[in-house]
């Protein structure tokens, strides 16, 4: 076919080109009198199939078009169909594959949680039955009271004090199991529904089914719009119901307050008048302002500068936190780590059930019931023995990363709120726009165009809040489960019946309304502050919008990417030298290090033979405590005070006095009884190593049983023993009795089991800690072999860790073995062999304590001498040239190659426009590399060049520049000071970074000479605003916007799921409101027990009260902070895409499909009746 003059092929004969009323081109075939959208010449010029296409070509018969509501869609003129998927790409197939893979993961997780629910049901049924039987036993035994160390009975199961503690602990366990089962039932229902929804979507959208056409996609978007309106209406109703609950709660409190006496009311009224008059006086003084207007304007300017600096620091902190979050390794599936947690918790629940079956009461049980329980116990033990997979170190590291991620998210939320508040303050100070440093020009966070609410093209974030790093309604972690999981991770070889299983009798020792999140503890905040990257030099000049910490053209340093302090906070191994810090904050990621260190210490002790060792091995707790762990140094003046507390009870009036909660044994001076100079441990007394600490942050008393030795002195070889710990007298609302795992007795046994008792300091001082070594037989009756009592009246509440060996005195007379008699004869030095007198035993213990005191004083003196010789930190500072040597090899290569020097937030054109309106003029977030784990605060300098000589001594060096440093050169740094006399010197001077103003930007120079490159960025004037990778950014955003029919179906089903769950929440709030109104109508003045004891109801009411107290301005700030937080979450995803090469669309799709099976119950249903 001949071509026209312009090279275009002519139309065939009988064909004509025309345009419709929309301006779209179509073709008329006059031969057949038909019209067609397809150019007849395309058959000759375009590929006929997708396999022949090159680049972005479409084959013959296909056309791409754009719809304002849907976006880009594709038309198949041959089949006369439309579709929203790009036929050239395989993203839809990849989505279907990921959905099928996740269905397998979700099915496994669902079966695990069902089994966990079934085990909890068994535990609840057993606990209810045990509670009834213990109550009956207490009623029968209440008339007869036996001594704790009475030798008349072989069992202390029905000792009144122990029995009362058993009853209260069982009661607390029943309540907790009821609440957990109620919550798990609702979560299981949601997860089953979500799993079924995903199955329906998979069946509908796979198997050769075609996607949605343009008309169907528009119908789905219209339905989505109506559902979101309904959700918005439901959210408003939810807020109204919560406010109603707050008013009802206040009415209950008012009814309680009316019972007070009239004088109290008068005094309160007088106080209110005083406070009112004072407020009126203050208000009057504020209106009568006198002074010069110029002074006020200068003060306002100073306040603006102060707020702007704080605003800059908040922005910089946000950038640092985003980078740190992006550096953390992401999970293969969101929530995949939760599945591993549930598997570990299933093992733990089985161990708890096995332990409860071991200690079940056989009283008034038939032989058939006993055999059934014994068969269940054997079956559980076989199941646990068959568990081959143990918690690996990799899983422990993932859990530590998850805890670090939670801490960073919490800090990011706080910084976001702070930035929003500072912006509002700046806005109120300035009548016009934000006239502060250009580095602070984030702009109005309340901009409607900058809103991050999800549009029709967005993800499900506005519906479900399932961002990778931001979930506002995520409940606080259960401390009991955190500790159980922590101990499970220490078992490196799975379930070992002959060793301790790191579980406690119930471990629900923290009362529900006294629990707080572990991240609120002071040490957790301190650790996160230590891990924070160093602050950059703050801008003080309003002309320095183009200033940076690097020369023109050099890539910006991402703050904290290779900060050593951050790397130190993410250690991959368990640091055994951090025991004091670990005990200062008992959370998951630090308890891992703690228990690892304790295990190392106890393992080292177990390898040592007890025979032939003298007094230091048997009685010096401080020396053995320093075997592998560096404990806090004790003040020698406090040693005598601690000795008055840490003693063992003897069979005397003092031991009986321990029952009353006040136990103060006499302390004799050293050397008072010279006849007992020999070590009592030679005589074979069993000992237990305990670690005690009071956690003032959580109001919890922490008890750790580390190990026991010389056990065979009280029990025959092959018997099964365990420890029983009780805090007496018992409390009705707190678990106070715990048991370790039963295991065969050996000479030395490692326990490493932790128990927590939620108790106040005042109450703890009235308690006595009782530790008993017991054995259990086939009759399930406890036989107390030996024990000790520790008075807590003088216990130190300074968060110090107290490690001590306690001698266990026998509860009844035990004949000495032949070998022990021979040792006692050889060591008695002309003393006749006779039965031990218990008063002599007490004297011997006091003698041992006195010698131990002298040893500890000597060690404390040595520590003081070492501190004088080596003041400062325990770890020496790192040399500058060694700072980068601690980095991993591949990270150093990335640093040098510039892979991490990409712009941290490369937004799309649309997002950039919104963010420019949201933030104003974007700014560079400066950063420096920290050479030390605890970096000093940088010196604030003016943006103009400095004329004084000020150079830092400790500097960080790039690895490749290390070899080029001469005697006259200093290493290249980002935070070095600028000296004008050296800025333009022709000779070889220090390398520097020039911070420039607009006035002298043309005089910029590079730190290093580079080869000549025409039109290089660094050779242009800094006044030119260079676009940063705009074409690539547009392509990236276009790919991320790509939407398939599967995405539309997921959006629709997620909206329906969110609406259904919101309706359930509304119904729960209506039921609770109705119940409170009925109670109020009956004249009751106290809230129901389920509201007072359930921590979820407490969080709900506190959240409602906080919202009720907020003003409109504060509510607006909260909404703006939430929007900014969502944007930060998206920025983290983009940074992760750059650093870890995880496509943003893959992250978004994974979040969508995991939303259905990750149910978080924010509003609980009314719990069952109490016991």
Swiss-Prot record:
Residues 606-616, 625-637 have a biased composition (Basic and acidic residues). CDD domains: C2_Kibra (cd08680), WW (cd00201). GO terms for cellular component: cytosol. Residues 9-42, 56-89 form the WW domain. Residues 534-551 have a biased composition (Low complexity). It comes from the Eukaryota. It holds the Pfam family WW. The keyword Cell inner membrane does not apply. InterPro entries: C2_dom (IPR000008), C2_domain_sf (IPR035892), C2_WWC (IPR037771), WW_dom (IPR001202), WW_dom_sf (IPR036020), WWC/KIBRA_Hippo_Reg (IPR051105). Residues 120-193, 223-257, 301-420, 836-870, 1047-1123 form a coiled coil. Residues 684-806 form the C2 domain. Keywords: Coiled coil, Cytoplasm, Repeat, Repressor, Transcription, Transcription regulation. The keyword DNA-binding does not apply. Its main location: cytoplasm. It is found in: Cytoplasm, Cytosol. One of its GO terms (biological process) is negative regulation of cell population proliferation. Residues 521-552, 603-637 are annotated as: Disordered. PANTHER family: BOMB/KIRA PROTEINS, PROTEIN WWC2. Negative regulator of the Hippo signaling pathway, also known as the Salvador-Warts-Hippo (SWH) pathway. Belongs to the WWC family. This is Protein WWC2. It comes from Xenopus tropicalis (Western clawed frog).
